[in-house]
């Protein structure tokens, strides 16, 4: 069942590169409100913002978003969501989507797709999405995580390295990983409770912990292109510029 999936938006104030990121103004609304509004359109039965900062919580209350305070000690959004899974006693089969709080233009269709994908694969603990990666510079860029799957879409490995490596040259068929995850709550709690593994610490990709623990991750191509994440002032300026252009009346 995915009709009742829950979407959680982890949001923290203390971003290293862009402090206060969730509250940055974009076309008259804080970024977290853009993410919330997009997520509501996904059809989730419930949308919750999970934060450790009262300033973010107050902003969410102002625009009517349900918000839960969580520990400031969490190392990741996954851990923040796992705290809610324990707090609310979510059933182990409950599907929970982790929506990145720094993607104000995130696709509602992709959020729903990730939940639906997990629902279709009862043997999976996580579902996630990809998009084709055709630019060679991005293929070599460690900021773009890549994923290799088997013929049925099961993840074999995620890496910041260029995989699969074209030994004979050329550009292989590469899939860029999109950081949108649907979890079963039981697996989410188990993954969060486990210590980081060596692969995760080397690559700084937390999904590798799930693979290392033996959980299965199903992967599919996203129905829409990935939305830009806001990590820096430059990213923020690009999103603001895009929305300003999009809101201008056609001539």
Map each language-model feature to its residues.
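N-terminal glycine-rich phosphate-binding loop and ensuing alpha1 helix
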Residues: 2-51
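A conserved hydrophobic position in a structured secondary element of the catalytic/binding core
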Residues: 51-52, 106, 183, 231
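Short phosphate-binding loop-to-helix
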Residues: 48, 54-116
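Short, high-confidence coil segments that cap the C-terminus of an alpha-helix
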Residues: 44, 92-93, 121-124, 215
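Conserved alpha/beta core of the MobA/IspD/sugar-nucleotide pyrophosphorylase nucleotidyltransferase superfamily
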Residues: 172-251
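Conserved core of the sugar-phosphate nucleotidyltransferase
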Residues: 107-197
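Hydrophobic/aromatic residues located in beta-strands of well-ordered beta-sheets
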Residues: 7, 47-49, 96, 127, ...
